[in-house]
């Protein structure tokens, strides 16, 4: 199985070109064809020699993904189901925001974090995506607009799809390098956000990288007992260890951290929990931001339901009165398989049902 050309960061592409006996500037030409002109085949790279095109075709593919399903919401959200070369399925979501087009990418096939409210973890991690498979999600979403003649360009990226990004650390970092490259897609680092469920040691590593990418932490509970009951990762990285890493990140980078907090009815949405959260954030209040997330129900996790609006507002008001910066996240795609992992999970169910029906007509 040939790798995608998108797996090469700019420097690696320069090295590959030199290994082929070509001049270094050829790498810049290939890069421009891929990320500025966004071609779908090497044959479209008309300023390259036939010999170099043949070498590219022999060693790489341009697009490693196959589009299986596209769902468009009334609010402009678009959800994509892509098939990988090995037949595995992943999801990508485009969201229209007031500040531009934002794409949520997946970094792993399945997830081992095991959050008890999440559709992504219904299927355990099968493998990491390589850099090229993550980049290709962005390129195919952009192609969706290019083909329609819509003069719109992806401006923001959130790494919050299926999987734990910091469990696929090096591929995710190379993804950042590729899409941030000023000769390519040139998406600013401050327009990119990566979300972790709390791998404390990787948060420290990320602080030391010196990149300008934004950090979000999936917190979802203000104390260890509650967090461990809904997020098993808290047993390995309890709140004390997690917040020591977060404080190190803030001291090292002087950058704000966003805390994701999903609102689960009668689980973590009480004023008591809001007060606990303000206490937890008191030392980093100036550089923290809480994102309150309305819950998208998942049939396999029917023990949970969405917090009533009045509970969300009471929680929000409590944080605000204590000086915590917070917002209630705007919902997207509520009329399609909205929750992360739902489209993939539902498609896999239907595929299994078809297979069983074929065996037992």
Swiss-Prot record:
One of its GO terms (molecular function) is rRNA binding. Keywords: 4Fe-4S, Cytoplasm, Disulfide bond, Iron, Iron-sulfur, Metal-binding, Methyltransferase, rRNA processing, S-adenosyl-L-methionine, Transferase, tRNA processing. The active site is at residues 91, 340. S-adenosyl-L-methionine binds at residues 163-164, 195, 218-220, 296. Disulfide bonds join 104-340. Specifically methylates position 2 of adenine 2503 in 23S rRNA and position 2 of adenine 37 in tRNAs. One of its GO terms (biological process) is tRNA methylation. It catalyses: adenosine(2503) in 23S rRNA + 2 reduced [2Fe-2S]-[ferredoxin] + 2 S-adenosyl-L-methionine = 2-methyladenosine(2503) in 23S rRNA + 5'-deoxyadenosine + L-methionine + 2 oxidized [2Fe-2S]-[ferredoxin] + S-adenosyl-L-homocysteine; adenosine(37) in tRNA + 2 reduced [2Fe-2S]-[ferredoxin] + 2 S-adenosyl-L-methionine = 2-methyladenosine(37) in tRNA + 5'-deoxyadenosine + L-methionine + 2 oxidized [2Fe-2S]-[ferredoxin] + S-adenosyl-L-homocysteine. Its EC number is 2.1.1.192. It is found in: Cytoplasm. It holds the Pfam family Radical_SAM. NCBIfam families: rRNA_mod_RlmN. It comes from Streptococcus pneumoniae serotype 4 (strain ATCC BAA-334 / TIGR4). [4Fe-4S] cluster binds at residues 111, 115, 118. Its main location: cytoplasm. This is Probable dual-specificity RNA methyltransferase RlmN. CDD domains: Radical_SAM (cd01335). Belongs to the radical SAM superfamily. RlmN family. Reaction proceeds by a ping-pong mechanism involving intermediate methylation of a conserved cysteine residue. The keyword S-adenosyl-L-methionine applies. InterPro entries: Aldolase_TIM, Methyltransferase_A, RlmN_N, RNA_MTrfase_RlmN, rRNA_lsu_MTrfase_RlmN/Cfr, rSAM. Binds 1 [4Fe-4S] cluster. The cluster is coordinated with 3 cysteines and an exchangeable S-adenosyl-L-methionine. Its cofactor is [4Fe-4S] cluster. Residues 97-329 form the Radical SAM core domain.
